């Protein structure tokens, strides 16, 4: 079950070893654990709904509370300390674009405020309910979560906007395709949410940011539908897709998103490299990008993040041995970790990795190999779970 006042599934957690705890205490001082607010106390303070009964709308307090907050630091503090914000008066769960249209017509006729909701991972305050004299309706799109159409000829896939990342990939991979969009919130964020927030994924170097992947779709606005055909190009006039990208629900509710997909790569691997310092690391990454090698990912950590990641990883004996080897090779204090990925056919992947290593060596890089990369890939979406662990130890962390 998803945590009501923290990140992710309550069956998943990330532990911090003694080394990581000692580092926190040395850098930040002792933690100050607090007493969390009780969910029951918050629910008891929720005012009655101002919405009438409707078959698509729930007025249950527990559901209204869940829709009122995202995952920003401010949201986190409100949940943990029981600072109850304004909550929606009801939550609708449409299963089709037609039901979204019905809800918007109803809201328009009765002057209700509408806030779209899907993955609930917003960190920019776009789920906040303002103080309002009229009712506020949250429209939860998570039941619109299917692959609606796959055009293999044009490599276009149409999804219900509430389809979360794991379902996007599972439904595409069943047909031999991938979208290749992997934000850190992948576990819960949705394809529609990616579009309306202009999301960037961890492998955007290969597949492109969401604005490059978004080919068209359908948005229901208060005054009618906005249909965006999947024309490959236009020589004149504004691109309606640009109105939707980054719109955060201001113009309407995206109900369908058509995205450009790619056949699954024959080979995919991730590789860890270390560079002596930030200046050389930055220059090396710039050179790699400008060389336009067919890499799928370049993820550079500065010295502090590198030290933190290695400490959090545990395996103190293995990490210690690696640190000694890196120091012997010229990467000691202030070193920066670069994680690079290749996602292509095997021949292209070998060529890209060979050329990348050759270029990186000019900047003093030390290649460690795919073992650390595989470990990173296996845990790539678990980073936000550290927020729960840190809070229990008395530290607050933003995204």
Regions found by a protein language model. Name each.
Residues 145-301:
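FAD-binding subdomain of flavoenzyme oxidoreductases
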């Amino acid at each position: 079950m998803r945590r009501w006042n923290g990140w992710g599934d309550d069956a998943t957690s990330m532990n911090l070893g003694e080394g990581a705890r000692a580092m926190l205490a040395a850098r930040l001082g002792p933690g100050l654990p607090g007493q969390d607010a009780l969910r029951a106390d918050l629910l008891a303070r929720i005012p009655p709904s101002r919405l009438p009964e409707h078959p698509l709308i729930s007025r249950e307090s527990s559901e209204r509370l869940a829709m009122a907050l995202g995952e920003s630091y401010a949201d986190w503090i409100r949940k943990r300390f029981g600072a109850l914000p304004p909550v929606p008066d009801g939550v609708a769960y449409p299963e089709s674009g037609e039901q979204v249209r019905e809800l918007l017509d109803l809201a328009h006729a009765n002057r209700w405020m509408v806030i779209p909701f899907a993955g609930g991972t917003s960190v920019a305050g776009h789920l906040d309910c303002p103080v309002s004299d009229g009712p506020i309706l949250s429209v939860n799109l998570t039941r619109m979560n299917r692959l609606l159409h796959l055009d293999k000829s044009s490599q276009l896939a149409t999804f219900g906007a509430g389809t979360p990342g794991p379902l996007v990939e599972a439904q595409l991979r069943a047909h031999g395709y991938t979208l290749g969009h992997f934000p850190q919130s992948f576990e819960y964020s949705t394809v529609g949410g990616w579009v309306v927030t202009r999301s960037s994924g961890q492998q955007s170097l290969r597949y492109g940011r969401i604005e490059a992947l978004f080919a068209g779709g359908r948005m229901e606005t208060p005054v009618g539908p906005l249909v965006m055909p999947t024309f490959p190009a236009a020589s004149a006039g504004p691109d309606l897709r640009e109105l939707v990208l980054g719109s955060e629900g201001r113009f309407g509710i995206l109900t369908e998103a058509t995205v450009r997909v790619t056949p699954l790569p024959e080979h995919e691997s991730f590789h860890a490299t270390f560079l002596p310092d930030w200046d050389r690391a930055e220059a090396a990454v710039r050179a790699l990008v400008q060389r336009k090698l067919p890499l799928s990912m370049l993820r550079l950590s500065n010295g502090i993040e590198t030290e933190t990641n290695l400490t959090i990883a545990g395996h103190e004996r293995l990490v210690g041995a690696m640190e000694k080897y890196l120091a012997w090779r010229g990467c000691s204090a202030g070193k920066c970790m670069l994680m690079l990925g290749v996602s292509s056919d095997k021949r292209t992947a070998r060529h890209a990795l060979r050329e990348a290593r050759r270029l990186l060596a000019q900047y003093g890089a030390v290649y460690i190999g795919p073992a650390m990369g595989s470990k990173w890939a296996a845990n790539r979406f678990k980073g936000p779970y550290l927020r729960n662990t840190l809070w229990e130890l008395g530290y607050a962390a933003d995204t």
